[in-house]
């Protein structure tokens, strides 16, 4: 039985993780739950259902309410709570289902204790990939990707000779704006952007999908996750989102992972690997006609892929800078302060003018994060 701490349990990934746990109760025990958002009612229901021994929240009102209603549970507040949840002695696996870098210190401390990291938070590797990889190597920490694309690549690479790998290919649905003209893109609304044709996700990641920044961040994540220095990492548009990742080998053979567009598949794999169990979710119905289309990314319309390649060339502080600047620009769009087309325009300008520095500690990461947020708010 695996003993889990779920960081970000009330978000989309967190709730789907608990759905998998609910379907396979004999395999898991939830030791700790941490919530970042305002989804208080959902969090209370999770506490009642899964009876964790540790919970963490980010607002004082919830802290006092939980302490009163659940007197036998250890309740923590803020970053202290994340650390307590992630490093609890009974926990052997951390599900990093939060967004942003707020959980980064807790994740690193858990890795130092040898706990397995089931990672859904791409910002962690984008901002601190070099640090995370060094800690994973030093402490022999296992990292299992939950992102559907990286989980697919992980499955394709498992047991393979990585020196024979030629290319890693991440697939992109193309987002809600795939078929809009350049003229239409200048007039898109928040409502247009948040209507994703395939995936049901949070607002921030849905905006990132529309700009393909999400795919750019995933290219960076794949670099740090798999460490294949001699393999090319690319992205292709695949509107059906049935194939999630492909590995091309030196002999031209391509392996892929194929399943319906649901995060339940990679979550269950990450939680149960190397074993496989019956799933509550259905696979692809091959008795029905299926279409698979692949298009190259239009990098003129979507410079985000080029920005990701820039980060991989420059490394250092460029990753945390790109990540934090994008977060601010997306938030400015969601509050109707800037237009959708401004996100990529401003992000490109910020990256063009940024002078990369070394980034070898968490203090460095958070300093760059702060600088990027300030610049992205002003531009």
Curated annotation (Swiss-Prot):
Q: Which family does it belong to?
A: Belongs to the DXR family.
Q: Which organism is it from?
A: Chlamydia caviae (strain ATCC VR-813 / DSM 19441 / 03DC25 / GPIC) (Chlamydophila caviae)
Top-level EC class, please? oxidoreductase
- Which annotated residues bind Mn(2+)? 147, 149, 218
Report a single Gene Ontology molecular function.
Answer: NADPH binding
Keyword flag Manganese: yes
Listed under catalytic activity are:
2-C-methyl-D-erythritol 4-phosphate + NADP(+) = 1-deoxy-D-xylulose 5-phosphate + NADPH + H(+)
Pathway assignment: Isoprenoid biosynthesis; isopentenyl diphosphate biosynthesis via DXP pathway; isopentenyl diphosphate from 1-deoxy-D-xylulose 5-phosphate: step 1/6
In UniProt terms, what function does this protein have? Catalyzes the NADPH-dependent rearrangement and reduction of 1-deoxy-D-xylulose-5-phosphate (DXP) to 2-C-methyl-D-erythritol 4-phosphate (MEP).
User: Which residues take part in binding NADPH?
Assistant: 10-13, 39, 121, 123, 202
Q: Where does 1-deoxy-D-xylulose 5-phosphate bind?
A: 122, 148-149, 173, 196, 209, 214-215, 218
* Gene label: dxr
Name of a matching Pfam family: DXP_reductoisom
Q: Specify the domain of life of the species encoding this protein.
A: Bacteria
Keyword Isomerase among UniProt keywords: no
Requisite cofactors: Mg(2+); Mn(2+)
One of its GO biological process terms is: isopentenyl diphosphate biosynthetic process, methylerythritol 4-phosphate pathway involved in terpenoid biosynthetic process
Keyword annotations from UniProtKB, A to Z: Isoprene biosynthesis, Manganese, Metal-binding, NADP, Oxidoreductase
E.C. designation(s): 1.1.1.267
Name of the protein in question: 1-deoxy-D-xylulose 5-phosphate reductoisomerase
